[in-house]
């Protein structure tokens, strides 16, 4: 007979889980032992938060839950930042947290904690399996919540004695299976078509859920069939979906070419858009134009985001059903404007090839990366000034080729995401990018990466500061505080973990070093002294209210 921990592992196997990330402890040792007899690979991490970041990348790249296991008390509380990041950014994650035995739940005892109450604000679902009979129910409902609608993180609490109790009966493969949805209601599709067909300057605004790999073909077909111009948030689909209709990325400071097009649009069709990516008050306040929202669940209403029509259902099916109903006559001037915005973006990117000297200009780094990134390369971005330059100017080749934290803007995600991408796609290149500040948030996982035999290249844009905060403080207050950092030796740091490190001393080194690093059989760190003197240009023509 299986015990609770063994039964839970079997449920994970039935759901197709291939990796579990975590850190052991007495309350979950039964689960760790059960994994010894499972084909699921156990990845021992250096911090629980980083385990969730790795799960988040698994969820984002596969659409299925990433799974982590941690012990009670501080093991559970260390999950919070990772879980709120996953929930905010639509990534399915299942966190399993150990708990004290049932008889100790009401006592003031070692590592006693109501993990469910801690987790409720940062997850879609949080529940403890308080009996062995309820374990499959809690598991099934948790996984369904994580993967359905707008995906996110969930928490399953496992008391120690429930993990050790005998599990009665068979384990159905139906636990956790999600029910497929159909397209939006026919009547709403007709209403949406009337609004869109009446527009002369319509713009599609693609959000994070539109960039799911499973939706890529449906997005391409919709854009090809309708000919509509589109823009995207930092996490939305890039030019790969329909290059000739793509106006570029928008968000954060509302001063990009695509933002001008969004301002001029007389109808906005949002697809998989989440207000956390780009606050509607920054782009739709005071506008009387119609909005059509296409999503997997009802949108969060906002004073500046009250769509006249919501198409709620399976995103792909709704797009397929809507496309034949659209006969849009796009104003030629608006279409030319979209082309002009795209050309302006391309011209800015082209400047990068000509920028030499030291420190290295951000556009030169973007240019050199563009030369080595292949269609099967995954690029993981941390948060900082580099993420603005990369998100605006780096061209993506397919859905979720570039991973970015645009909801919570959580520091430290890039390195764990790169590790997860390499585990999922061991034969494909992986490049991650961070600042010198964000890198040290999760740099301990370099030991994990070396132990796993990971291969990826991590670029550190080094400014010895929290630069994204610095230039915003300078713009807002005319002076700075709490942003300057000390230097550290990246090459020596890499060597300490048995990895390889480089320091760029001339911009012309960067291309050859990148090519050499991508051939290495271990993790590689590249230290790039960066010239952020043009950062204030990122905020030109920006109202002060747009400075976050």
Briefly describe each language-model feature range.
Residues 5-8, 26, 31-32, 341-416, ...:
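Active-site diphosphate/adenylate-binding microenvironment
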Residues 66-68, 156, 379, 402, ...:
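Well-ordered beta-strand positions enriched in small/hydrophobic/aromatic, beta-favoring residues
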Residues 133, 169-171, 287-387, 507, ...:
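Phosphate/pyrophosphate-binding active-site segments
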Residues 23-25, 43-53, 68-75, 130-131, ...:
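Active-site nucleophile and cofactor-binding loops and adjacent substrate-binding regions
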Residues 96, 105-111, 216, 302-304, ...:
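Thiamine diphosphate
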Residues 28, 48-53, 276, 386-388, ...:
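Short acidic loop-to-helix transition motifs that present clustered carboxylates
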Residues 127-130, 352, 502:
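Glycine- and charged-residue-rich phosphate/anionic-cofactor binding loop of Rossmann-like
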